[in-house]
């Protein structure tokens, strides 16, 4: 039987509920507990696939092809697990399921209401994940802030969940923010008190309060919060701003979060001590300041780093694996893009994206890397930019993608045939994990040390097979394909120190303890370039 830890948030949004959930999960995993995680997003969208990255950040893709909230990326990286798309519950999914059941007559003529039908569906979705994963503990993060009208059905559902599962099988962790007023030189606990009061007014008494803050809170402040929020002082946990998000599990473990939760939920473990040695080593490796490599991410949505959060984290993982510090600069690939700015970098990365804006800047960045032997890594749209650049530099100046010019006379990149028949936008791309066959003697093979891999995809466009010969005659190496050789999955370039583009998204499979092979190889190449310049 699974036990549930529900994480709610108060005071402000983006407070760190996802990192808190992931950190608690990491701590429990280090005790040998089987943990999974769920993210509840209280928006009416069915999934994250059509959301603006400027507003919502990265769209994370699971193996089973669900477009999800970026917090699932935190869960997978911290817990080192592969989650199902069912781990992302949205209001859209809940209402769609309830309406479908109503149309089928499954409610036997009842007046369908928020309570009990919507709340029952929410609980069913949570329990289905628990049953499928056989997890001992299920982390359930409720998105938004306590008091939001959108979150109310979910708050009511998890309140009911605790009553039905029992006190020993469900607990609540409330994440709040304790602001520091520099003028007064003091912390203010009133927002935390009011947020907890709001939660208790909805029928939920938190078992633990996690206080986010810029600086560390002293014992007197913790005692004050414990007194006014009616929790034991040992259940008031402070997580001040850290050098790295990967430090948070260590901070929480040092505050005895693990033992408190194990006792609160009556969980028996094979050991009384968590094994966080490997995690501690990762944190130390991430603190390395020298040697240093500079990487430019030439992208479209660079104003919000969360739009490329998995790429950022993957670069950090690869830096730790190569014992170097990775300095990341975010370069906007717009019309006024100055190519000379790239001279200072040891490597370039062209991330995925959609639409024409910024594509010319990305193509020019690829050409710069080709002409100057700079290591360059292209992901999804990055592979498209690489293919177009190779063609343009080798006698096909009009090379383009039909994504940007439907009437292109040299469509090196074209929409996949099966995609041309699709009208709906959401959930209709080539999504999820697909196998890839790697050619021996290539950079890809050197990185993976395998000829058969699986990676996650999110795209509608591919290299046009009619232009394969043109690309290979220009020095391109097709180093990865679908098992039937029909789809180009990876491309490299002869006589270049490190030039690799992939149609898939390797950033979704990188872990702090297992840097993705391609990112690891890319950073190694950037490190070599810097060393050879000395």
Curated annotation (Swiss-Prot):
Q: Into which family does the record put it?
A: Belongs to the CTP synthase family.
NCBIfam families with a match to the protein in the record:
PRK05380.1 (NF003792), PyrG (TIGR00337)
Instruction: State the oligomer form and interacting partners.
Output: Homotetramer.
Pathway(s) where this gene product acts:
Pyrimidine metabolism; CTP biosynthesis via de novo pathway; CTP from UDP: step 2/2
What species does this protein belong to? Methanosphaera stadtmanae (strain ATCC 43021 / DSM 3091 / JCM 11832 / MCB-3)
Q: Which HAMAP family match?
A: PyrG (MF_01227)
* Residues noted as binding Mg(2+) in the record, renumbered to the chain: 71, 141
A GO cellular component annotation in the UniProt record: cytosol
Tell me what this protein is called. Answer: CTP synthase
